[in-house]
């Protein structure tokens, strides 16, 4: 081969390599983004709903064209009884169940269902951000579930078709609960009848009088319109209803490290945003319910509240061995 031909050949190779590189870049730019499904069971105007939408916004802004987050609210994909199973099957990549939903994966998270454990949301937050609280995020890794952060909803209130002032007022009444042994024991302690039902069915159950009452936060009572089918709400602040945002270990490890870092930072920011909304909505949603005049709100006196505490606090001892006395003590210390 002559020198001229050799130069021409080399130029052709360089040209073809450049074309191939450009073609590869073009194909990459045309590739569909990776879908991330975020499923939850509440309305979009709740702290969880707004958090999920903020997460979508941040991920798609920071990783444009690479990831698309699709949010499915109101149990559109999965209900609260099967969303964790769907997560482990990779049918969805992110869910944020209430802490009550994890007892199949770890008994330690039953802590958050203990009645009258936390005095307010500040105490809840102090515990969740403590070493003990942060360790609980990793308590389900062996089962394939990765905890990424806590999301607040608020303190729970009782609602019923008749006034609930003293523990004996709950006797014989049916209350919907999440699938939690602690919550079942809580209502059994006042001789009420706990009924485990999905969140999506609560309104109809109340409307048809299939159950007499339920427990929930002001945000959920308002957004799901439970106040329209319950004549009485008691501001009991007897427990906390918070969530844990989780993914599967399989999905989390499948992400490139740099992308995982961006997604985690986006989630942290979205959770902080959701928690701000949760704090702001407590009084706003409560007042909206009062203004509707659909439900009468009862405020307990210190003596009446003490009666509920005395009736339900024995539940702590019932679950102490499963949860761990050290965790219960750490939670109690957060009230100080």
Swiss-Prot record:
Part of the tripartite ATP-independent periplasmic (TRAP) transport system DctPQM involved in C4-dicarboxylates uptake. Required for the utilization of succinate, fumarate, L-malate and alpha-ketoglutarate. Binds succinate and malate. The lineage of its organism: Bacteria, Pseudomonadati, Pseudomonadota, Gammaproteobacteria, Alteromonadales. This is C4-dicarboxylate-binding periplasmic protein DctP. (S)-malate binds at residues 48, 101, 176, 216, 220, 243. Belongs to the bacterial solute-binding protein 7 family. NCBIfam families: dctP, TRAP_S1. Disulfide bonds: none annotated. It comes from the Bacteria. InterPro entries: DctP_fam, TRAP_DctP, TRAP_DctP_sf. The complex comprises the extracytoplasmic solute receptor protein DctP, and the two transmembrane proteins DctQ and DctM. CDD domains: PBP2_TRAP_SBP_like_1. Succinate binds at residues 48, 101, 176, 216, 220, 243. It is found in: Periplasm. Gene3D superfamilies: Bacterial extracellular solute-binding protein, family 7.
